[in-house]
From Swiss-Prot:
Belongs to the bacterial ribosomal protein bS6 family. This is Small ribosomal subunit protein bS6. One of its GO terms (biological process) is translation. It comes from Bartonella henselae (strain ATCC 49882 / DSM 28221 / CCUG 30454 / Houston 1) (Rochalimaea henselae). Binds together with bS18 to 16S ribosomal RNA.
Amino acid sequence: MALYEHMFLARQDIAPQQVDELLNIYKGVIETYGGKVGRVENWGLRPLAYRIRKNRKAYYVLVNIDAPATAIAEVERQMRINEDILRYMTIRVEKHEKEKSAMFSRLDRNGHIGHDEKHPRSPSRQREDVIEGVE
């Protein structure tokens, strides 16, 4: 079996629970075809670089998969049909990364570190800019 990184973008107007349901459906398809799902990173609702089907934001989900090509073909076929999925991309990789992805672990615009279910974001703090010589 081959190793893949699969990412999909779900519409902004569905609930986060529906994103988890979509993920579980696709996990089931992969397991039906004899594959395994590794690490899952749910990046949450993020802005898009440009509008896709009148959406300015989307739920980003990254999944590490160890499965045969037939499983990937079936998942992509079902994603093409599902209107809640805006975009998807599957890339074959040599090995899965042990650490979190670079996008997930980088600082966001507000200076917060990316978060997951085990380590939620801390509440935002007021930023106080101090200018030397000005009181």
